[in-house]
Each structure stands twice: as C-alpha cells, then as structure tokens.
C-alpha cells in the first residue's frame, strides 16, 4: 500500500491519471469523492511483482495536501485497507451513535466528516461537540478530536439529534 499527500491539490492532478493508467498500467478506481473534507482523493491499483516474482496489485492512495483533509482521508480510506490486508476485523474506525451537543450547519452538496470530541454525558449517553472551524487547513481542529461525525447533506442538524461518530481515540468520562 502506498499513500501520498498533496498531489491532488496542486497542478499535478493533470499528470496523475495518465501516469497511473498509461505509464504504470494501473487502474484509477475513483479520482474525486463527494465528501468534505477530502474531495480530491484518488484510489488506484498498479500491477507490480511480489518478492517471488508473482504479479500482484499495489494499492495507491493519493490524499489531499491540506493537513486535516489528509488525516480524515487516511482514517476513512487507508486505515480500513491496512486493517483488511492484515486481517483485522472489523476494518476501519468503530462507529457509535452520539447526540449532538449543539446545532451544526451542514454542507448542501456533500457529506461531511466533522472533527469532534465525543464524551459521556451526565445521563450516560455519548455526546459530541465540534472542535471548531472545520476548514481543510485547520490542523487545530484535530488536536483534541477523538471522532469524526458522519453528517448528511442538508441545511442543519439540531442539538440533541443523533448521528454516527467514527471513533479515532478514547472517549473521556464526565
């Protein structure tokens, strides 16, 4: 498995597809994703030879160059692939239902993976709070985040509503 960052966010995307397909004989499985952050993510397979000379396919992930986008797409695409390759089940981040601690504005065109802190509420249920500004370049939004909220396309989602959260770290008690 190969993962690179930054190729998709500069002038190089024009070169990525022809290089993988024509020069390396690979296949691009997706080149843009309708999600936020991480839209310019690419996944491809490239034929190579294993150590014993047998033909195998190498997985290639091209992740966005913005730090928050790179970390989110690493967790959503690369980690599950590594888990699968190593036989770890279930693959990927664990998903749990959480209640929103406050209203969140939604993207009207793309699903969003919103950086958040999940903790145990007074009633014993899991509650999520945003880490703040969610721009792709906002590394600070990752500092305290222990989860990614899976938010639908829409206008807004209200305080107390339930969403799924992908856990990236430990949950703190009250």
Regions from the language model: what does each represent?
Residues 1-10:
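Single conserved hydrophobic/aromatic residue that forms the stacking wall/gate
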Residues 19-174:
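Flexible glycine/proline-rich
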Residues 11-18:
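Glycine/threonine-rich flexible loop motifs
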């Amino acid at each position: 498995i190969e993962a690179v960052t930054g190729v998709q966010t500069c002038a190089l995307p024009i070169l990525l597809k022809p290089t993988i397909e024509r020069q390396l004989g690979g296949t691009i499985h997706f080149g843009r994703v309708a999600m936020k952050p991480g839209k310019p993510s690419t996944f491809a397979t490239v034929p190579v030879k294993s150590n014993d000379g047998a033909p195998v396919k190498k997985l290639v992930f091209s992740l966005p160059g913005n730090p928050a986008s790179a970390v989110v797409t690493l967790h959503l695409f690369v980690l599950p692939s590594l888990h699968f390759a190593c036989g770890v089940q279930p693959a990927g981040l664990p998903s749990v239902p959480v209640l929103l601690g406050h209203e969140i504005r939604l993207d009207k065109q793309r699903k969003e993976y919103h950086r958040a802190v999940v903790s145990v509420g007074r009633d014993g249920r899991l509650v999520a709070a945003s880490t703040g500004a969610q721009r792709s370049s906002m590394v600070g939004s990752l500092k305290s985040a222990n989860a990614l909220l899976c938010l639908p396309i829409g206008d807004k989602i209200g305080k107390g509503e339930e969403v799924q959260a992908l856990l990236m770290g430990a949950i703190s008690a009250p």
